[in-house]
Amino acid sequence: MAQAEGAYHRPLATSRLELNLVRLLCRCESMAAEKREPDEWRLEKYVGALEDMLQALKVQASKPASEVISEYSRKVDFLKGMLQAEKLTSSSEKALANQFLAPGRVPTTAKERVPATKTVHLQSRARYTSEMRSELLGMEPSGECEVDMRKRAAKGSRPADERQSASELDLVLQRHQGLQEKLAEEMLGLARSLKTNTLAAQSVIKKDNQTLSHSLKMADQNLEKLKLESERLEQHAQKSVNWLLWAMLIVVCFVFISMILFIRIMPRLK
């Protein structure tokens, strides 16, 4: 019965280390889904123990399939990232860190229809969104100020209280409207800055393309000129060689004729 409650959802038999890891993982998921005190330290210790058990499971001889180990790692990393997000100061930072968390894809136990880490992820997102909304409206996170104003308006016993509630509500609405206008101006400024940077980048890219095209054109022209000069030098070299050959032939013929004449003239002189 204990194995059915804690065992991971797969047909093969699991080792004792994996059973302990799954049981501790289920415990951590249930603790993460509950409302905890700020000084609660057990969940962080449990997650640290999960990391150690996961590392031991990876090097075990009878370790599970790689998909199962990947799912375990995904859930442990999610719990670790959730604890790190809770330590941040502002709700906007918490919400941003929560967006980058990746919950598990497969339920840890057979009783779960939806992975517990996914439920915890949705709860954290809703809580951080509520805190951000409360900070923007200048209200307490629990919404006690809004409930108190509604109660005062509903009683109707004192006109002064009604006027005070109405003025407080108007103040909240004005503040909210001012924040919205400020955000709209900032977004408009960012859009203008982005447009300016985009136009500047396009201009720089266009100039670079023109420079590159001009350089390629000049390179082609220089290559054509180099080919023409090479052909001209080759023709000139061939002409020089031809003239040299003719000169050598003439010299050889002259020497040959001179030798013949010399041989014929010398006997007559004797």
From Swiss-Prot:
Keyword Isomerase tagged: no
Taxonomic superkingdom: Eukaryota
Record's keyword terms, sorted: Coiled coil, Endoplasmic reticulum, ER-Golgi transport, Membrane, Protein transport, Transmembrane, Transmembrane helix, Transport
Stretches of the chain found on the membrane's Lumenal side: 264-270
InterPro entries documented for this protein: Vesicle_transport_protein_Use1
This protein's record includes keyword Transmembrane: yes
Membrane topology reported for the UniProt record: Single-pass type IV membrane protein
Major localization class: endoplasmic reticulum
GO CC terms: COPI-coated vesicle; endoplasmic reticulum membrane; SNARE complex
Residue intervals on the Cytoplasmic side: 1-242
Transmembrane residue ranges: 243-263
Coiled coil: 206-242
Compartments, as annotated in UniProt: Endoplasmic reticulum membrane
Single biological process term from Gene Ontology: endoplasmic reticulum organization
Subunit structure: Component of a SNARE complex consisting of STX18, USE1L, BNIP1/SEC20L and SEC22B. Interacts directly with STX18.
Protein's job: SNARE that may be involved in targeting and fusion of Golgi-derived retrograde transport vesicles with the ER.
UniProt record similarity statement: Belongs to the USE1 family.
PANTHER family per record: USE1-LIKE PROTEIN (PTHR13050), VESICLE TRANSPORT PROTEIN USE1 (PTHR13050:SF10)
Name of this protein: Vesicle transport protein USE1
Organism the protein comes from: Mus musculus
